[in-house]
Amino acid sequence: MSTEIQKIEDNNLKESQMWNSKELKEAIKEIEKMFGKGSIMVLGQSDNLNVETFSSGSLLLDNALGIGGYPKGRIIEIYGPESSGKTTLSLHAICEIQKLGGIAAFIDAEHSLDPKYCHNLGIDTNKLLVSQPDNGEQALDILEMLINSNSIDLIIVDSVAALVPKTELEGEMSDQSIGLQARMMSKALRKLNGLIAKSNTTVIFINQLREKIGVIFGNPETTTGGKALKFFSSIRLEVRKSENILSNSEIIGNKIKIKIVKNKTAIPFKTATISLLYNKGIDKIGELVDLLVSYEIVEKSGVWYSYQNEKIGQGKTSVIQWLNADEKRTNELIQQVKKIIEQKE
């Protein structure tokens, strides 16, 4: 037993000598002199390495992401079929950043951003920067300049498929342009990845699905722009339309299923099914009801709902009406749910 204790003491002594080594201190000093303060740090003592987050606009998605929302200073890819809710999901992120007093920018490569729809979702359009670039290189140059300003909290690029290289635009329709976009994206992301982390800017790329030709086995679907975005993304969300939402036999929205295909900040492969209402976006009150029941804050027995042993009413609609009737109570319950999500991280 005494031999083991002696070994531990010897190891502790060696460790202490290593940390107090003159050579190590000189090396750290030289690194900071050449590359700036903070270029090397002790992992356990660095506040900079804690992942800062902001809400996605959906409590259900925040819960599934495992860290309470989107991480700051990271690249995120949202992809899926057309009209599946990708842009709406991204616009809600802008809304949440603005609520925190942050600045957001939207690079509209598709030239399809609707100001009225943005306003309906709660975005202050007078405080949203928008760019409609002529080609892919211009879009990525604007993206780099915005990141280098160190003043932007969130940038949306809509979409990768619309980032067409200048060479392709200026060429003939018959010209072959295989791999041009992939090379452009790869070069840009290698350059931007470090800048994004240093500026603490979150960049969300919206992407589309294409089908590979000649695939017999496995999934023929792939995203545009090559493999670089898949590699550099900290989070990849696959968005697919699920089912229609009906009210008196009229379609008022649709449910979308979000699968977290990649997550470098928490456990991946979790899913969230959220409701998107036409011209309103995410049904926040509806998903709050689901989480209140899930965390047993609101009790459900058959079709009856109750809160603190007092009956609310029958059906989910009665709970939504109960929440809409008292804004203060609703905000308190939202904070209660957020605390539970934070404790689960």
UniProtKB/Swiss-Prot annotation:
GO biological process: DNA recombination; DNA repair; SOS response
Superkingdom in the source lineage: Bacteria
SMART domains cross-referenced by the UniProt entry: AAA
Primary location class: cytoplasm
Binding-site list for ATP: 80-87
Intracellular or extracellular location(s): Cytoplasm
Record keywords, A-Z: ATP-binding, Cytoplasm, DNA damage, DNA recombination, DNA repair, DNA-binding, Nucleotide-binding, SOS response
Matches recorded under Gene3D superfamilies: P-loop containing nucleotide triphosphate hydrolases (3.40.50.300)
InterPro entries: AAA+_ATPase, DNA_recomb/repair_RecA, DNA_recomb/repair_RecA_CS, P-loop_NTPase, RecA-like_C, RecA-like_N, RecA_ATP-bd, RecA_C_sf
Keyword ATP-binding among UniProt keywords: yes
GO CC list: cytosol
Entry GO MF terms: ATP binding; ATP hydrolysis activity; ATP-dependent DNA damage sensor activity; damaged DNA binding; single-stranded DNA binding
Function description: Can catalyze the hydrolysis of ATP in the presence of single-stranded DNA, the ATP-dependent uptake of single-stranded DNA by duplex DNA, and the ATP-dependent hybridization of homologous single-stranded DNAs. It interacts with LexA causing its activation and leading to its autocatalytic cleavage.
Database matches in HAMAP family: RecA
Family: Belongs to the RecA family.
Protein name (database record): Protein RecA
Organism: Mycoplasma mycoides subsp. mycoides SC (strain CCUG 32753 / NCTC 10114 / PG1)
Encoding gene (name): recA
